[in-house]
Amino acid sequence: MNLIAAAIAIGLGALGAGIGNGLIVSKTVEGIARQPEAGRELRTLMFIGVALVEALPIIAVVIAFLAFFG
């Protein structure tokens, strides 16, 4: 049962991060296409957003370790 819980935690964490990163990057590209002069600011905000979204799989791995070994 712990193995299933760990797999679900990692899988859903990766799924959420993948969808979130895709949305962030697509909206950034759309914004740069509309306003090329704002590209530098949008790119900076994109990297901050991607970093925040990537925290989710890291937290999911920690929860999976706790479920598996705890």
UniProtKB/Swiss-Prot annotation:
Q: Fetch the HAMAP family from UniProt.
A: ATP_synth_c_bact
The name this protein carries in UniProt is ATP synthase subunit c
State the family named in the UniProt similarity comment for this chain: Belongs to the ATPase C chain family.
Q: Outline the subunit composition.
A: F-type ATPases have 2 components, F(1) - the catalytic core - and F(0) - the membrane proton channel. F(1) has five subunits: alpha(3), beta(3), gamma(1), delta(1), epsilon(1). F(0) has three main subunits: a(1), b(2) and c(10-14). The alpha and beta chains form an alternating ring which encloses part of the gamma chain. F(1) is attached to F(0) by a central stalk formed by the gamma and epsilon chains, while a peripheral stalk is formed by the delta and b chains.
**What are the protein's GO molecular function terms?**
lipid binding; proton-transporting ATP synthase activity, rotational mechanism
Question: Which positions make up the signal peptide?
Answer: none
What keywords appear on the UniProt entry?
ATP synthesis, Cell membrane, CF(0), Hydrogen ion transport, Ion transport, Lipid-binding, Membrane, Transmembrane, Transmembrane helix, Transport
What residue intervals traverse the membrane? 4-24, 45-65
Q: Which InterPro entries match?
A: ATP_synth_csu_bac/chlpt, ATP_synth_F0_csu, ATP_synth_F0_csu_DDCD_BS, ATP_synth_F0_csu_sf, ATPase_proteolipid_c-like_dom, F/V-ATP_Csub_sf
Cellular component (GO) terms are: plasma membrane; proton-transporting ATP synthase complex; proton-transporting two-sector ATPase complex, proton-transporting domain
Query: Which membrane topology term applies here?
Result: Multi-pass membrane protein
List residue numbers at the site (Reversibly protonated during proton transport): 54
A Pfam family that this protein carries is: ATP-synt_C
The lineage, from the top, is:
Bacteria, Bacillati, Bacillota, Bacilli, Bacillales
Q: Which organism is it from?
A: Bacillus pumilus (strain SAFR-032)
Q: Where in the cell is it found?
A: Cell membrane
Query: What is the documented function of this protein?
Result: F(1)F(0) ATP synthase produces ATP from ADP in the presence of a proton or sodium gradient. F-type ATPases consist of two structural domains, F(1) containing the extramembraneous catalytic core and F(0) containing the membrane proton channel, linked together by a central stalk and a peripheral stalk. During catalysis, ATP synthesis in the catalytic domain of F(1) is coupled via a rotary mechanism of the central stalk subunits to proton translocation.
